[in-house]
């Protein structure tokens, strides 16, 4: 590999590492059959950790175009995380408790 190839590869590695360093983790708790907040703004690459503080299970999901996911059922003290890789609005709900709703705005 020539010097340009090495420099290019090094720059690519640095960009990947920089993206990982700047990504943030946000924590949303579930307690009293409700999310701790109604709206959250995150950036592309950020992760949201959903922490269950209720004495029963939740099943957090989204069918949104910007991010579709289903975390499955998880109990008290457990958490599951989602990383957002595309800008847009993500409507989050609980399959067990239909009144639980959260909007996540993912920005660039």
Locate each region found by the language model:
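Extracytoplasmic copper-binding redox domains, predominantly the cupredoxin/blue-copper superfamily
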Residues: 2-108
